[in-house]
Amino acid sequence: MAATASLKGHVLVLSGRLVGPDLGAVTEIGKQLLDLPERQLTVDLSHAEDTLDIAGVQWLVTIYRSAKNHGKQLSFVGISQPQRDALIISGFESIIDD
């Protein structure tokens, strides 16, 4: 299933496969999340498939760093073990342990 996103308050809920060809649909809603006035933001991965390729890792790292650059704190919830492993293998475990 292609990646989709919905914004529920200050929580970005991701669904589907977080892989390169499917990420375009979630990018615009990710920008909307960063534009919110709240300082505490959340990305919920509990509805996303376990599949996470390097483009998916890069997308998560990019939104995390963009939030930091906007003076906000972004946390991830609902991370599956395969998603966590992909971030660790890629060297980006700091975004989930922050």
Task: Tell what function each PLM region has.
Residues M1-V13:
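Short beta-strand/loop segment at the start of cytosolic alpha/beta domains
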